[in-house]
C-alpha cells in the first residue's frame, strides 16, 4: 500500500520524482480500503478457458496481501462453445448486463482465437466493442491482453495490427522504458515475458495513437503500454499471465498436429527449452516422423523448464491494482473519486 506524505519531509517529494506512489493527506483521507470488483472478459477458446481464469485470478489474488478482490468472469455469447464449456459458463459466469448494472472497478479482457485477417470481421467484434465502450466511461482501468490490445488499437485509434513473417513465440527479454511510471515502479528494469502471436502493433503505431510505451523488447517489440491519460487503458502484447508449462502445451499441440500433416513442424519457442529438453523433443519428433507411436515426453521436459517472468508479472499487476485503488470511487460503479481528473487520474506531470 502507498506511503502518505503527512509532513514536509523532502524524501516524499524525492520518492515521487523517482516514480514511487506517495499520497497526499487529502487523497489518503478520501481513500476507502474496500473490496475491489474486477471483471474478467474471458474470450479464450474452450481448451484454454479455465486455465486462463486461473492464470489471471492468481495474478490478481497475489497482487496485494491486504485488499479483497471479487472477480466477475463473463464472456461473449457470439463465441463458439462446446457443451462442457457452455455448462461451465452457465454455472459460474455472470451476464454482461448484470455486470454493467452493478459496476466494476477494473476490467481484464483476454485474447481470443480468430479466423479473419481483419478483426472487425469476427463475430465477436460488435459485442466486444460494446464492452470496451462501456468500460471507457464506467470502469477505472481496463487491462487488455494480446488480441484485446489489437482490437482496442484498431477500434479506438485506427491502428491495425500487422501480420509478421514468422510467429513471435517464446520467452523474450524486455526493458522498462520509463522507470518513473507508477505501473512499472520498483519492478526489475530488465525481465522476461512470454509471447505467442503472429501479429504486432509497433512502437510507432502506439506513439501515433498517443499511447505511451512502458516496456519493450528488441526482438518481440512492445509488451506494455498505457493510454495517454496514464491509467484508463493498459495494453499487453505478451502473456505475463502464462504458467510455466503454457508454451510447452502450445508446442505439444502444434507438434502433434504436424504428425498428422495438419501443420508444418513447429520451431522451438525462443529461449524456453534448454538443450536437454530440446533433445527429448527432437527425438520424439524424429521418431514419430518415421511412423513410431510414442508418448509425448512431457514428464521429462516439465522439470527442465524455468519460469523467469511470474514475479515481475505479479509486481506489474500489483502496481495496476494499487493505481486503481488510489483513484476509484468509494461507490462501486463510479470510476473516479471526486477531484480526480479522468484525463490524468494519477496526476502525472
Curated annotation (Swiss-Prot):
Alphabetic keyword roster: Acyltransferase, Amino-acid biosynthesis, Cytoplasm, Methionine biosynthesis, Transferase
Keyword Acyltransferase annotated: yes
Subcellular location(s) per record: Cytoplasm
Main location: cytoplasm
Example GO molecular function: homoserine O-acetyltransferase activity
Top EC group: transferase
Enzyme Commission number(s) from the entry: 2.3.1.46
Reactions catalysed: L-homoserine + succinyl-CoA = O-succinyl-L-homoserine + CoA
Annotated active site: 146 (acyl-thioester intermediate), 239 (proton acceptor), 241
Gene that this polypeptide is encoded by: metAS
Binding site for substrate: 167, 196, 253
Recorded metabolic or biological pathway in which this protein acts: Amino-acid biosynthesis; L-methionine biosynthesis via de novo pathway; O-succinyl-L-homoserine from L-homoserine: step 1/1
Function according to Swiss-Prot or TrEMBL: Transfers a succinyl group from succinyl-CoA to L-homoserine, forming succinyl-L-homoserine. In vitro, can also use glutaryl-CoA as acyl donor.
Site annotation Important for substrate specificity: residues: 196
Similarity remark: Belongs to the MetA family.
Family annotation (HAMAP family): MetA_acyltransf
Protein's name according to its UniProt entry: Homoserine O-succinyltransferase
Pfam family, any one: HTS
Source taxon at top rank: Bacteria
Membrane-spanning residues: none
Cellular component, GO, one term: cytoplasm
Residues of the site described as Important for acyl-CoA specificity: 113, 147
Biological processes per GO annotation: methionine biosynthetic process
Record organism: Thiobacillus denitrificans (strain ATCC 25259 / T1)
Alphabetized InterPro entries for the sequence: Class_I_gatase-like, MetA_family
Amino acid at each position: 500500500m502507498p506511503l502518505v506524505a503527512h509532513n514536509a519531509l523532502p524524501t516524499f517529494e524525492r520518492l515521487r520524482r523517482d516514480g514511487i506512489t506517495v499520497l497526499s493527506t487529502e487523497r489518503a483521507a478520501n481513500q476507502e480500503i474496500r473490496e475491489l470488483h474486477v471483471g474478467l472478459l474471458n474470450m479464450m477458446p474452450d481448451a484454454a478457458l479455465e486455465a486462463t481464469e486461473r492464470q489471471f485470478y492468481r495474478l490478481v489474488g497475489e497482487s496485494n496481501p491486504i485488499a479483497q478482490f471479487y472477480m466477475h468472469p463473463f464472456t461473449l455469447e457470439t463465441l463458439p462453445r462446446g457443451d462442457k464449456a457452455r455448462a461451465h459458463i452457465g454455472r459460474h459466469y455472470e451476464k454482461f448486463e448484470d455486470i454493467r448494472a452493478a459496476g466494476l472497478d477494473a476490467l481484464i479482457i483476454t485474447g481470443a482465437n480468430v479466423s479473419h485477417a481483419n478483426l472487425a470481421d469476427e463475430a465477436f467484434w460488435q459485442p466486444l466493442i460494446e464492452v470496451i465502450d462501456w468500460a471507457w466511461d464506467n470502469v477505472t482501468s481496463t487491462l487488455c491482453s494480446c488480441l484485446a490490445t489489437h482490437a482496442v488499437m484498431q477500434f479506438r485509434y485506427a491502428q491495425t495490427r500487422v501480420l509478421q513473417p514468422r510467429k513471435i513465440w517464446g520467452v523474450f527479454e524486455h526493458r522498462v522504458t520509463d522507470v518513473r511510471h507508477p505501473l512499472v515502479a520498483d519492478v526489475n528494469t530488465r525481465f522476461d515475458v512470454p509471447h505467442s502471436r503472429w501479429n504486432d502493433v509497433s512502437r510507432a503505431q502506439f506513439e501515433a495513437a498517443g499511447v505511451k510505451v512502458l516496456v519493450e523488447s528488441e526482438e518481440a517489440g512492445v509488451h506494455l503500454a498505457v493510454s495517454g491519460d496514464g491509467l484508463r487503458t493498459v495494453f499487453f502484447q505478451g502473456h505475463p499471465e502464462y504458467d510455466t508449462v503454457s508454451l510447452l502445451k502450445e508446442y505439444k499441440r502444434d507438434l502433434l498436429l504436424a504428425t498428422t500433416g495438419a501443420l508444418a513442424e513447429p520451431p522451438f519457442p525462443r529461449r524456453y527449452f534448454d538443450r536437454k529438453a530440446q533433445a527429448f523433443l527432437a527425438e520424439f519428433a524424429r521418431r514419430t516422423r518415421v511412423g513410431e507411436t510414442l508418448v509425448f515426453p512431457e514428464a521429462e521436459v516439465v522439470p527442465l523448464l524455468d519460469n523467469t517472468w511470474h514475479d515481475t508479472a505479479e509486481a506489474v499487476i500489483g502496481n495496476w491494482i494499487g493505481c486503481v485503488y488510489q483513484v476509484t470511487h468509494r461507490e462501486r460503479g463510479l470510476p473516479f473519486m471526486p477531484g480526480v481528473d479522468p484525463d490524468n487520474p494519477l496526476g502525472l506531470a
